Amino acid sequence: MIAVDTNILVYAHREDSPFHDTALRRVAELAEGSAMWAIPWPCIHEFLAIVTHPRIYAPPTPLDRALDQVDAWLESPTLAVLAESGHIG
């Protein structure tokens, strides 16, 4: 399983990124493919914080558009969101 980090999510989303085309193509391949892939929950939080921050991007991505992007990723039937389980041992 491939886990996608924050920077790849940001590059795939932000058209002004020099890595946009490559990242977008790779995330689309994962989302549309048959193999399981993952996004760690903290990376979703980081993605939202980064792309909507006005000191990082001018203009920043509007929150509703950033949330729509997250929703689109979450619609992939092969996506697993990685989070702490609370299970110890």
PLM regions with names:
Residues 1-39, 54-69:
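Short, well-structured N-terminal submotif of metal-dependent ribonuclease cores
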Residues 15, 41-45, 71-89:
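Acidic catalytic patch
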